[in-house]
A protein has these predicted regions:
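The catalytic core of metal-dependent phosphodiesterases that act on cyclic dinucleotides
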Residues: 48, 67-142, 154-191
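Regulatory and interdomain segments flanking nucleotide-handling catalytic cores
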Residues: 1-17, 35, 39, 43, ...
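Catalytic core of bacterial c-di-GMP phosphodiesterases, primarily the EAL and HD-GYP domains
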Residues: 1-2, 18-95, 170
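A short, internal acetyl-CoA/4′-phosphopantetheine-binding micro-motif in the GNAT/acyltransferase core
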Residues: 14-20, 137-143
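A short, well-structured catalytic beta-strand-centered motif of the EAL phosphodiesterase domain
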Residues: 1-13, 32, 67, 130-132, ...
């Protein structure tokens, strides 16, 4: 109410705890499909990502909502990527079912902020994922001689070995972009 920016790390858990997460997810789906439809229909090479909460991943109730919102827009399901953090995959069986239904409908699925959560590598290997998004904390360490910078080549190699698309988050410098490009990272996003 005071006009200040509030981080999703703060309001998403509040929305989940208060039972408002479904309404928030529905609002985001409506906004994305309405606001981006003309752009996505005009250029089929573009995509937009919708971040999902752990509750969304467990219930899967957002999929029919998304498909109703896409009906008649001309937007292809492959242009809507679905993302969840490692926390969203903690209930692996429910998440796996949701991911399989999303992928069978044509959506690409990404694990967001990879490396900052608690998932095991065996969980990562077992999930039907299309993309891995490297957290910005690793990207910002590129060229900084930080201990974190030694981790990023291993994340990239692992994602390539799993045949996942790779997205680097928080790319802000030419040096970071060049390093990531030369390492085979396909997509970058700024902060």
């Amino acid at each position: 109410p005071d006009g200040e920016w509030v981080s999703p790390e703060m309001f998403i858990p509040l929305a989940e705890h208060s039972g408002q997460i479904d309404a928030l997810t529905d609002l985001m789906i409506a906004a994305v499909t309405h606001d981006m439809a003309a752009l996505l229909e005009a250029d089929r090479s573009l995509h937009v990502a919708i971040n999902l909460s752990a509750g969304d991943m467990q219930s899967g109730r957002f999929l029919p909502v998304l498909h109703r919102a896409l009906a008649g827009t001309g937007v292809q399901p492959s242009q809507i990527w679905l993302e969840a953090t490692e926390r969203g995959f903690m209930h692996a069986e429910q998440a796996r079912d949701t991911l399989l239904r999303a992928r069978s409908a044509g959506h690409l699925v990404a694990i967001d902020d990879f490396g900052t959560g608690y998932s095991s590598l065996s969980l990562l290997e077992s999930l039907p994922l299309d993309a891995l998004k490297i957290d910005k904390s690793f990207v910002s360490a590129i060229g900084q001689n930080a201990a974190t910078s030694v981790v990023i080549p291993h994340i990239i190699n692992m994602a390539q070995g799993l045949q996942l698309h790779i997205v680097a988050e928080g790319v802000e410098t030419g040096e970071q972009a060049q390093y990531l490009r030369s390492a085979g990272v396909e997509f970058a996003q700024g902060w």
